[in-house]
Amino acid sequence: MELQVVPVDFTAKATSQSLLPLLIALTVCFLSIIILIFVSEFLLYSSVLVLTLLLYLLLWLLLTPPLQFFLLTLSLCFLPAFCIHQYILQTQQQ
């Protein structure tokens, strides 16, 4: 029985594929935060938030494995959106 060496190709293609979901996530998150800051009505804000989250979830489901999808969705989309949501609620009550 002879062992065979299988060459492994670590090129820029693997790096760019792993960075693409992160760049898409940051772009979607940044644009959604900018849009949500300028929206003052709660119903419109909620609609924009839901549509943004759905778009974001679809992108992550297409581009990442499940664990990375879950962790990055929490850290890049839900937490900033929740902070903005709390800020808008506090400013509307004052």
From Swiss-Prot:
Q: Name one Pfam family in it.
A: Papilloma_E5
Q: Which UniProt keywords apply?
A: Early protein
Protein origin, superkingdom = Viruses
Looking up InterPro entries in the UniProt record yields:
Papilloma_E5_alpha
Family the entry assigns:
Belongs to the papillomaviridae E5 protein family.
**What name does UniProt use for this protein?**
Probable protein E5
